[in-house]
A protein has these predicted regions:
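Bacterial N-terminal signal peptides that target proteins for export
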Residues: 1-10
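Sec/Tat signal peptide C-region and signal peptidase I cleavage site
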Residues: 19-25
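Central antiparallel beta-sheet cores of small beta-barrel/beta-sandwich binding domains
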Residues: 30, 36-107, 111-112
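Short, exposed beta-strand-loop hairpins at the edges of beta-sheets
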Residues: 108, 113-117, 123-137
């Protein structure tokens, strides 16, 4: 067996160093996450091949367990309870992120096109867009 030349070792080392970081496992998004506004807590679970998230707690819910979706742009939906309201749905796995989903924001009553990316063990980045480039990104932290 021939010894491996230093040139081959150097090329392999450079290729490994340049390789993209390993993608977060698809299930890394599952669990309870703290939102940056109104002390919200969203629980993300599997919904078939997709994921969905429901609002399980927040300032409005703590103040009134029967709080309603009063800001919804659809008047007929303003009587829905905020507790357990599905606010994330339809996302599909796409490499290291979840795409093509929708995010409902009960603070302004709008539904936005979304992308979810896991950033290490301590952050979920949720980007919601009216249409590109009119987007906003929030960073959520896991609740352990």
């Amino acid at each position: 067996m021939k010894p491996v030349s230093p040139r081959v070792v150097a090329v392999l080392t450079l290729m490994l160093a340049a390789a993209p970081a390993r993608a977060a496992p698809a299930d890394a998004v599952l669990g309870r996450w703290a939102t940056p506004s109104k002390h919200g807590v969203v629980e993300i679970t599997r919904c078939g091949a997709s994921i969905c998230g429901r609002l399980v707690n927040g300032d409005d819910i703590r103040a009134n367990a029967d709080a309603r979706d009063v800001n919804n742009r659809n008047v007929a939906q303003r009587t829905r309870r905020l507790k357990d309201l599905t606010i994330i749905q339809g996302f599909r796995p796409d490499g290291d992120k979840w795409t093509d989903g929708s995010v409902y924001n009960p603070e302004d009553g709008g539904t936005y096109h979304g992308t979810i990316t896991i950033d290490g063990a301590d952050a979920l980045r949720l980007k919601g867009c009216i249409f590109w480039p009119l987007c906003k990104t929030q960073t959520w932290t896991p609740l352990r």
